């Protein structure tokens, strides 16, 4: 709380609800969007205005360069609340970074350009710039 850091929460929606019950002002980046269905992710984003979701280590939101229709609805409804992610928690995963970047660029190109830009990098820049503000 004191430093207004982001919590990168690896958990399901129940874990998010419990954290927010203790600290309604918590700033949460929901890892892997909880591996939940897009309809449920949308419901959580509607309910919690300070909740953001990353798309790391999941591939159900796009296939063959095309965004899944249910995920498209989520991205259009909440263009400022999703971030692309890679989840390179083991060294072996670094080998696939270029391939993952190409895959992400392909499905992002299936979205309107402004939404693709936000999800692809601008949302991350905005979120993490808020932690870099000079101290007064």
Predicted regions and their residues:
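Catalytic pocket-lining loop regions of alpha/beta-barrel enzymes
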Residues: 1-84
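Charge-rich, low-complexity amphipathic helices
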Residues: 22, 41-42, 63, 67, ...
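Divalent metal-coordination and catalytic microenvironments
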Residues: 32, 53, 87, 116, ...
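Residue-level detector of flexible, active-site-proximal loop/helix-junction positions
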Residues: 35, 59, 89, 123-126
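Active-site neighborhoods of metal-dependent hydrolases
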Residues: 58, 85, 90, 94
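Mid-to-C-terminal alpha-helical segments outside catalytic/metal-binding sites
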Residues: 80-81, 91-136
